[in-house]
Amino acid sequence: MGQGRVGAGMAELAIGNNLQIYRHGTMTSFQYFIVSRMQPLMMAGISTYCLLDRSLEEALDRLSDITSLIEVVDEGPHFISDASIFSNYSGKFILHAPYHGVNIASSFEAIREASVKVMTDCFSVAVEIGADVVIHPGYYAWEQERERANQQFRASLQELRDAAAERSVTFYFENMGDMNFFNLRTPADLDIIDGTGFALDVGHANLNGCLPAFLETTFGHMHIHDNDGKRDTHSPVGEGSIDFVPVLAALQRTGATSVIEVKTFAGVQESIRALGRIGVAF
């Protein structure tokens, strides 16, 4: 049972103890030992990213029948203009702050300041619904601007920390894909966030060839999707090259929240089935 309307029960993600076969092949005895020892009731959820062609209300209605944790992509058709929409639902929400048209590392101070304002506005909504927030770490347009962009990011980081502290909001920076101008692409880049919360995007890490190293870090949230290691397709689990057995082991180790973040609702359903084949059930 999903979170549903107010009064409905809560659903959680369970790791089974009778795993035998994984889609990418037979699990090694070590993989079997790790996953079979995972504790049950590990919570997972779904991002509204799969339903961006629908209204936010319709997306919440459909996803709340499946899960008790929903990450809302707070832009486009799912931009939250009024937090009262969430009063019709129980369960837990996470907000993915707007990312198109904003850059908290912009060399242009006016753009940086406006981008921070967009983030803090998202924090204000998060306070109303008790949600954590995921943020993109910004980018630079030219290699010659990289140091300036780092300085701008550090200024934004301090302002965001102050705003989050004032509102008692937890936020995470997400690792980016394989385009060179993005901040935070590899574990070596984690220093830039200076101990602030980290959201591990599994697909993005795979694109940069550093997923195993990222799985050894500390993170508080995770985006689950698959790809072939070349394109950021946000494909259903099992359609790409990612081995999700160690991913689930890292989730168990950290106790992080996680959401499926694929492009289509059918992809969500396929991902649930694929995760079920390695002992995960909603």
Regions found by a protein language model. Give the residues of each.
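Ser/Thr/Pro/Gly-rich low-complexity, intrinsically disordered segments
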Residues: 1-3, 10, 19
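N-terminal pre-domain/capping segments
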Residues: 15-17, 21-121, 282
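Histidine-acidic metal/acid-base catalytic patches
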Residues: 24, 30-45, 58-61, 132, ...
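Active-site acidic/histidine proton-transfer and metal-coordination neighborhood
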Residues: 33, 37, 105-197, 253
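Acidic-and-aromatic substrate-binding clefts and catalytic sites of carbohydrate-active enzymes
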Residues: 50-57, 69-84, 103-105, 109-110, ...
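Acidic (Asp/Glu)-rich catalytic clusters
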Residues: 60-65, 79-97, 121-129, 161-166, ...
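Generic enzyme active-site microenvironment
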Residues: 69, 94, 172-173, 199, ...
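Short loop/turn segments at strand-loop or loop-helix junctions that form parts
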Residues: 96-100, 132-140, 225-227
